[in-house]
């Protein structure tokens, strides 16, 4: 019935006179995106031209041939505009790429790579899922070696440079120098308990000797200086809430040229050694934590070698220090832990009287309060403020007391910039006649910025004071470092530093500039 209707319709339209049968209209697959010839094939279209014979040439007319070679989409335009080809009706218009936007890159053929075994690729049947490797935050950092249950890291820096005033003279006298600084760190990798070693040292040698007849200056002829700082800390986990804390420490060095302690006429600086230990217990009571420590330290000076070939004893500067320390802290909230700390100690010298007839034995201590914090790992550290005092047995020596501050803060400003702030205060011994001691305070700010992962720039600024009763010293310094990391093992380091000393004592002012370049080898 349906076919007869189609035939009747074609007859009415005169289709019976056509050489081809009448077909229904063919639609494209998508009405929204039509294409040429999508509705009906070109050869079956009723609107196609008939292949009639041209009466002029007698050759059948052929349609659909491409235009001649000289034809183009462009023609004459008085404004010299290019004629654009109009898109087929209904086709989507191409997206316009504006200025400054990257064009779509051309499609590239996939690379031909060698085949990888399923076990190596982690796609073998029955294989456990492979863990994704962590991104290395410091690709040029020190790796270290495992020795048993310890991770050991060692390094050495060899550098040289020029110091415009190594002796801290009022009238600068410069000298070239070299420095060798080894380091050794060992950290235990145990499930329980801990043992850590941190040992650093340096030796600075100068190629210049200074005259022995430098007036009343305390600068020796040879100013070569060693420096060693080491600490061994341990922890024994008795229970989940009880721990035994222990530590051994060592400090080797010489008197600072900026202090008035060195005597006149030295051939070289006498070396001192400060060593001691700590033993204590740490107990947790829920959020409350109590730590009690006992400390024993000893300070020893070697004999001073004078320019006339004789030696002078420094036994009056040797002393033992015994003390006890207690710290109470409370975990107020995650990342905030306030604390209170108290310490008491006594110092007993080897000789009752020093070289000027003063009794230097004393009792002292401090009380301070502060907090340790960690805010989303962007700001971490500890800050405390307190009060310290020291009473001397000799009534001629005044009590030494004052405000004490201590801080160690790290602020990660960005992923490339880190800011550090440090503060320290101490009550130190002195050899000046009639002076009880010195109260020292030091503050420093350090900014580290990674221009690249292998190029690190550092800027440091510092300020410090030292009070010797009537004498007041102020110290300033500014330093800039640049580290170029070649590999994880080798790095090149350059440094420029300038120091100022301003004192109310006549002739004690000084300034110096240090330029240094060296190589660091680490593993």
Question: Language model features by range: what are they?
Answer:
Residues 192-196, 240-244, 285-292, 335-338, ...:
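Repeated loop/turn-to-beta-strand initiation elements of outer-membrane beta-barrel proteins
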Residues 154-156, 197-199, 246-248, 292-294, ...:
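Membrane-embedded beta-strand positions of outer-membrane beta-barrel proteins
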Residues 158-166, 192, 201-207, 250-254, ...:
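Transmembrane beta-strands of outer-membrane beta-barrel pores
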Residues 2-12, 19-155:
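N-terminal periplasmic/intermembrane-space "pro-region" immediately following the signal or transit peptide
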Residues 178-184, 226-232, 273-279, 320-326, ...:
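Hydrophobic, lipid-facing positions within transmembrane beta-strands of outer-membrane proteins
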Residues 184-188, 232, 236, 279-283, ...:
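Residue-level signature of outer-membrane beta-barrel architecture
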Residues 482-485, 489-491, 495, 511-523:
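Outer-membrane beta-barrel "beta-signal"
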């Amino acid at each position: 019935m349906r076919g007869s209707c189609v035939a009747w319709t074609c007859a009415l339209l005169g289709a019976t006179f056509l050489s081809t049968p009448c077909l229904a209209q063919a639609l494209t697959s998508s009405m929204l995106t039509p294409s040429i010839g999508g509705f009906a094939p070109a050869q079956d279209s009723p609107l196609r031209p008939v292949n009639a014979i041209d009466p002029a040439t007698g050759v059948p007319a052929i349609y659909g041939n491409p235009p001649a070679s000289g034809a183009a989409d462009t023609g004459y335009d008085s404004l010299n505009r290019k004629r654009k080809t109009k898109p087929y009706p209904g086709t989507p218009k191409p997206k316009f790429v504006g200025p400054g936007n990257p064009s779509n890159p051309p499609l590239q053929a996939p690379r031909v790579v060698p085949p990888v075994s399923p076990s190596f690729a982690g796609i073998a049947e029955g294989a456990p899922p492979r863990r994704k490797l962590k991104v290395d935050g410091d690709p040029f950092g020190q790796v270290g070696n495992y020795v048993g249950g310890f991770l050991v890291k060692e390094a050495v820096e060899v550098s040289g440079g020029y110091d415009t005033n190594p002796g801290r003279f009022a009238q600068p006298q410069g000298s070239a120098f070299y420095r060798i600084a080894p380091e050794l760190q060992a950290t235990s990798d145990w499930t329980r308990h801990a043992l850590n070693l941190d040992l650093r040292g340096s030796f600075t040698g100068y190629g210049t000797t200074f005259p022995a007849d430098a007036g009343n200056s305390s600068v020796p002829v040879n100013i070569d200086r060693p420096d060693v700082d080491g600490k061994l800390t341990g922890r024994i986990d008795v229970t989940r809430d009880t721990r035994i804390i222990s530590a051994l420490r060592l400090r080797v060095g010489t008197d600072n040229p900026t202090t008035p302690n060195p005597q006149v006429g030295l051939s070289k600086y006498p070396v001192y050694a400060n060593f001691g230990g700590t033993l204590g217990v740490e107990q947790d009571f829920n959020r409350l934590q109590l730590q009690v420590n006992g400390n024993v330290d000893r300070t020893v000076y070697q004999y001073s070698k004078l320019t006339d070939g004789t030696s002078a004893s420094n036994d009056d500067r040797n002393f033992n220090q015994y003390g006890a320390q207690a710290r109470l802290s409370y975990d107020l909230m995650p990342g905030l832990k306030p604390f209170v700390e108290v310490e008491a100690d006594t110092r007993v010298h080897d000789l009752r009287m020093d070289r000027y007839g003063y009794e230097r034995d004393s009792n002292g201590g401090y009380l301070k309060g502060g907090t340790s914090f960690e805010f989303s790992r962007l700001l971490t550290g500890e800050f405390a403020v307190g009060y310290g005092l020291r009473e001397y047995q000799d009534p001629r020596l005044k009590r030494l007391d004052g405000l004490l501050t201590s801080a160690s803060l790290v602020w990660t400003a960005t992923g490339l910039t880190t800011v550090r702030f440090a503060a320290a205060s101490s009550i130190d011994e002195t050899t000046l006649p009639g002076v009880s001691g010195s109260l020292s305070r030091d503050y420093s700010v350090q900014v580290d910025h990674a221009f690249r992962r292998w190029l690190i720039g550092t800027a440091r600024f510092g300020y410090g004071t030292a009070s010797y009763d009537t004498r007041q010293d102020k110290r300033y310094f500014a330093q800039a470092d640049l580290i170029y990391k070649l590999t994880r093992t080798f790095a090149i380091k350059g440094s420029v530093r300038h120091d100022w000393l301003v004192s109310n004592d006549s002739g004690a002012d000084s300034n110096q500039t240090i330029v240094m370049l060296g190589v660091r080898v680490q593993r």
